Amino acid sequence: MKLYRSLDRYKQRSVDTLMESMIENDMLAFREQCVAAFTRLGHDELPVSAGTGMPLTDTFDREYVFLRNSRSVCRADTIITVTGDSMLPTFRDGDELLVEYTPEIEVGEIGIFVVAGEGFVKEYQPDGLHSHNPKYKTIRPVQDDNFRCVGRVLDVITEDMLATPRELAVLNEIYSSKRDN
């Protein structure tokens, strides 16, 4: 600071300009890092039950979440929230799941299913859809149930996957400027 004060005002202005440029470059680099490090995923307000079932409707709200890139985040198509306790201890009520849309999953995988118009998160087995909580029975869909697989559960969202407030502010600014153009 002492050296800065010893400069005449023109040299101080030059130092100020250089510092502003350096700060701007740091911010641009941080923005680029955020864009490269995060994926924007839609969070479907589509209830899926880890319990006795949740009626599905054709309309639902969609909000977006920025998640740190990982194999499961990059494969995911959406985020869906668990309702109920039938998948304890694997999933808890309120857990947010990364889901990849697919009409089929392998035996032993956990998926999102529609049975008779209700959404479920269950483990797929040849004899039906299994809960991990032993107090729930296996769901054995019949042809009249209009049974279908919506997607494969890839992972549960954890705190460390989420953007920090600073990262989120930058990502929201970037996204809003893209949307406005």
Protein language model features and the residues they cover:
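Acidic/glycine-rich C-terminal interaction modules and beta/coil loop segments
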Residues: 29-33, 37-38, 46-50, 55-64, ...
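Charged, helix-prone or intrinsically disordered regulatory segments positioned adjacent to compact structured domains
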Residues: 1-45
